[in-house]
Curated annotation (Swiss-Prot):
This is Chaperone protein DnaJ. The keyword Thylakoid does not apply. The keyword Heme does not apply. NCBIfam families: DnaJ_bact (TIGR02349), PRK10767.1 (NF008035). Zn(2+) 2 binds at residues 171, 174, 193, 196. One of its GO terms (molecular function) is ATP binding. SMART domains: DnaJ. It comes from Methylobacterium nodulans (strain LMG 21967 / CNCM I-2342 / ORS 2060). PANTHER family: CHAPERONE PROTEIN DNAJ (PTHR43096:SF48), DNAJ HOMOLOG 1, MITOCHONDRIAL-RELATED (PTHR43096). The gene is dnaJ. Residues 5-70 form the J domain. A zinc finger (CR-type) spans 141-219. CXXCXGXG motif repeats lie at residues 154-161, 171-178, 193-200, 207-214. Zn(2+) 1 binds at residues 154, 157, 207, 210. Keywords: Chaperone, Cytoplasm, DNA replication, Metal-binding, Repeat, Stress response, Zinc, Zinc-finger.
Length: 388
């Protein structure tokens, strides 16, 4: 069965802390526990999946490896990180969970087998690879060569895990099901078979090349086509490029998760780009031209009209990002802000003071004049109301 992303399984963000992981695990383990869902195979699978995800993400080293390589970091053997059984921390939660099950408890009998046979064909796990690209690369598209470790079928034993001339035998403990059920007080607990570790079969004479796992780890090189117009967080699926299946099962898929590096000039909103550009006080007052960058590496000229104010926006049509799988292209918006001069010389100060003395407040600064006029009217109105 294909493995989902562990963070997705627990329903938490990749930045989730220990407390958030523990809370999510507790909630899901209670929801999918077999004693609350008797005979529900889907709940049984999810219960096992939740436990495996928590055992990985609650361990610092395993979590770091998983964040970098996904399921490929633990590709030796079936069942994921730490094996398919229950980890030590799981027992700490079970007492709390069992308290909530008391009303639904079912008296258990002797150990017994349950579930489908584990020894059949099994699809390989899906893999995740995080790829970071620049905004320019998202604009043009690119072909990226990646290298990743992954599990492939052992060529020596053809995936059986057994040495040439021998073959696995059915596990006598679980009868080939891979799981056993045992009574514990009022509760019946299902767990991975301790004898075959969930495989449903025993390999008496394991293959020397893979140690009985049926798969070996190899580093593969793949070419990934990143189309123009991709956005941050986009997922690219490469079918059949995940881990090899077990016992003749199909391979899983490889998912490329894209992230785009922050750009020093441009901010992106869909297919549109935004760029803040400083202009001088003189250019803003008298008009002029400025040269601005474009995402394709070129430059273009923007005409600044006289009297331009801070945050004035100019639209450059068709200078933004391409729309993914479309001929449409976004726009580039240039937002200017007027830079107040600093470290003025004596003569510059005199010129500015002369300008201020010879100008009309209403003509030169209509916004300021209008604002202070409205303030005066407001307070005059308050004074008139007080006298009345």
């Amino acid at each position: 069965m294909s493995k989902r992303d562990y963070y997705e399984v627990l329903g938490v963000a990749r930045t989730a802390g220990e407390g958030e992981l523990k809370s999510a695990f507790r909630k899901l383990a209670m929801a999918y526990h077999p004693d609350r869902n008797p005979g529900d195979k889907e709940a049984e699978i999810k219960f096992k999946e939740v436990n495996e995800a928590y055992q990985t993400l609650s361990d610092g080293q395993k979590r770091a490896a998983y964040d970098r390589f996904g399921h490929a970091a633990f590709s030796q053997g079936a069942g994921g990180p730490g094996g398919p059984g229950f980890g030590a921390d799981f027992g700490d939660f079970m007492s709390d969970i069992f308290d909530t099950f008391f009303g639904d408890a079912r008296a258990g009998g002797a150990a017994g087998a349950r579930g489908g046979r584990a020894g059949g064909r099994e699809r390989g796990a899906d893999l995740r690879y995080n790829l970071e690209i620049t905004l320019e690369e998202a604009f043009t598209g690119k072909t990226e060569t990646i290298r990743l470790p992954t599990s492939v079928t052992c060529e020596v034993c053809a995936g059986s895990g057994a040495k040439a001339g021998s073959k696995p035998r059915t596990c006598p403990t679980c009868g080939g099901y891979g799981r056993v059920r045992a009574a514990q007080g009022f509760f019946a607990i299902e767990r991975t078979c301790p004898n075959c570790h969930g495989r449903g079969e025993i390999i008496d004479d394991p293959c020397t090349a893979c140690g009985g796992a049926g798969r070996v780890t190899r580093e593969r090189t793949l070419s990934v086509n990143v189309p123009a117009g991709v956005d941050d967080g986009l997922r690219i699926r490469l079918a059949g490029e995940g881990e090899s299946g077990l016992r003749g099962g199909p391979a899983g898929d490889l998912y490329i998760f894209l992230s785009i590096k922050p750009h020093p000039f441009f901010q992106r909103d869909g297919a549109d780009l935004f760029c803040r550009v400083p202009i001088s006080m003189v250019t803003a007052a008298l008009s002029g031209e400025i040269t601005v960058p474009v995402i394709d590496g070129s430059h273009t000229t923007v005409r600044i009209p006289a009297g331009t104010q801070t945050n004035k926006q100019f639209r450059l049509k068709g200078k933004g990002m391409p729309v993914l799988r479309s001929r449409d292209v976004g726009d580039l918006y240039i937002q200017v802000f007027v830079e107040t001069p600093q470290n003025l010389t004596k003569r510059q100060r005199e010129l500015l003071q002369e300008f201020d003395q010879h100008g009309s407040q209403a003509d030169n600064h209509p916004e300021s004049a209008g604002f202070f006029s409205r303030v005066k009217e407001f307070f005059d109105g308050l004074s008139g109301s007080g006298r009345a």
